[in-house]
Amino acid sequence: MLAKRIIPCLDVRDGRVVKGINFEGLRDAGSILEQARFYNNELADELVFLDISASLESRRTTLEEVMKVSEEVFIPLTVGGGISSVERAREVFLHGADKVSVNTAAVNDPYLISRIAEKYGSQAVVVAIDIKKVGNHYMVHTHSGKQITQYEALEWALKVQELGAGEILLTSMDRDGTKEGYENNSLRMISTAVHIPVIASGGAGNLEHLYDGFSKGCADAALAASIFHFRHYSIRQAKEYLHKRGVAVRF
């Protein structure tokens, strides 16, 4: 059985880690480097660094910040935000990222996924999918959740898999920052339909929510921010809890 992964996420804006609710109302959650060092020492399986305003503001992720984080951590580092070309992905890799996450740019130019995957391998390409329930449909949103697209979540997930994505980071905008648990219906729908790993994101408020993301949502990994940033739980506590409940995790 493949071990399930626990992945803290650094949402970065203006050089600081921030956290909001439903993609709004951001509050400060500490220093980028302090949080990165903490998670590197905390048994995190990977670390995600998302410049959450890069696409919205039509700018690029700060490479200097990426490099500083990569020098501090010895776990896989995924970087996203404003990556809209193979050349930009190359720069991010050269500054220490192990994977790149594309979101808005992939919706605007789906074959960007293929171009990056062909050059660096599918394992290096994470497609972040931000979804919100509209009526009875889960719709994909871009530009930090500000713009709705024509894609339904499952349709887009299958498409990015076909184009060469190695992993999907699925965030429920409805649950983001609420601490009410992952949106396991959409998570299960997509996890069981694709053959690439799916990372659950948006809503983790306690350790049972992590367990539910794996058991009910069929996720391959669980991403969380608030519960770890503000030290409600440690990564070790999360893994010990999951292990006791029969979930395979790495220590």
From Swiss-Prot:
The active site is at 11, 130. Disulfide bonds: none annotated. CDD domains: HisF. Keywords: Amino-acid biosynthesis, Cytoplasm, Histidine biosynthesis, Lyase. Its main location: cytoplasm. Pfam families: His_biosynth. It catalyses: 5-[(5-phospho-1-deoxy-D-ribulos-1-ylimino)methylamino]-1-(5-phospho-beta-D-ribosyl)imidazole-4-carboxamide + L-glutamine = D-erythro-1-(imidazol-4-yl)glycerol 3-phosphate + 5-amino-1-(5-phospho-beta-D-ribosyl)imidazole-4-carboxamide + L-glutamate + H(+). GO terms for cellular component: cytoplasm. It comes from the Bacteria. IGPS catalyzes the conversion of PRFAR and glutamine to IGP, AICAR and glutamate. The HisF subunit catalyzes the cyclization activity that produces IGP and AICAR from PRFAR using the ammonia provided by the HisH subunit. Heterodimer of HisH and HisF. Belongs to the HisA/HisF family. HAMAP family: HisF. This is Imidazole glycerol phosphate synthase subunit HisF. It comes from Chlorobium chlorochromatii (strain CaD3). The lineage of its organism: Bacteria, Pseudomonadati, Chlorobiota, Chlorobiia, Chlorobiales.
